[in-house]
Amino acid sequence: MRSRTLIALLTSVVGSLGVVGAAAVGARAGVKGQRAAAQRVVDMLPIHADWWRERQQHEGQLLYVAIGDSAAQGVGATAPGRGYVGLLARRIRHRSHMSVRVVNLSVSGSTTWGAKRDQLPKLRHYAPDVCTVSIGANDIADFDPDKFERNIRAIYGAVPSHAVVAELPCMFVPDRERKVAVANEIVHRVADEFGLTVAPLHTITKRVGVRRTFFNSYGDLFHPNDRGYEVWASAFEPAVDARVDTVAAIRHYLSVREAENLGREAGAVANARAEQDTDGAEALDHAARQGPGPVERLRHRMTGSIAVPDERDQSDEPDDHPGDVGRTA
């Protein structure tokens, strides 16, 4: 009995040592792999920076400017254009049916202070149609709430009023998450003061969960991979879509001078005109089903035009270009 017990005990100990040994080997391999991935990230940095710098020379009907750090550079993706900035640029192009010039001012490793110092002076040279800001993750390691808020205020005060600014992403580590919570409170409060739209990046990355985030991360376990950047882009998409629609409305319903004079109100005025135009089109369609009389009365109410009586003989050919007196193009 004793011998059987001793054999069982030895088997258990050897088995446990085997598990511990395997775990240690796995841990060493994991650390080694993470270090190798970190080195690959270092090698990526100049490649991504050069790629975006070359893209700045491209022409486009719309201008998209990005402020940020290595995530805006797309570090960790299989190609620079597969980062969230590249994905958003592609979405803007598809939604607007216009070509897009991307000026990516982001700098890998940048903090809020670095963005204020290095990126804001360059931003002054551009008048972007779309602007995104995602900065602050690199502040967390040595987090100072007062300095963070001063830098965020400087950045948010310098970007266009239509800029979309992002929360810091979920980091899942309790100590870091406590700092992130303070940082995101500042992001929301200052963005609200400046009237900026906040992309819910923390909310969305937290919803994904730690397990999926692990598989959505590059080998360094810090930067997203292609799947991770799709998650990041999804946090910006609703606000970017709304901005693209507003730009389209401004270009359709306002002259350049009118848009300049209206300033921050240009989007609201253009969207109101677009909504009025849509409502008017629906009303005209409804009136058309009731006959020509209701159509003319409604057109007069909408445009202030007066219908010209039709005095042609029945045999006259119809006018190829009918119009109303006072109708605007």
Enumerate the language-model features and the residues they cover.
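N-proximal short alpha-helices
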Residues: 3, 61, 104, 164, ...
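Electropositive phosphate-/nucleotide-binding environments in soluble metabolic enzymes
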Residues: 7, 82, 226, 230
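Alpha-helical cap/lid subdomain in secreted, periplasmic
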Residues: 117-249, 281-287, 292-312, 324-328
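Short, charge-rich amphipathic segments
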Residues: 11-29, 48-56, 80-95, 113-129, ...
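Secondary-structure boundary/capping motif
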Residues: 53-57, 61-63, 92-95, 195, ...
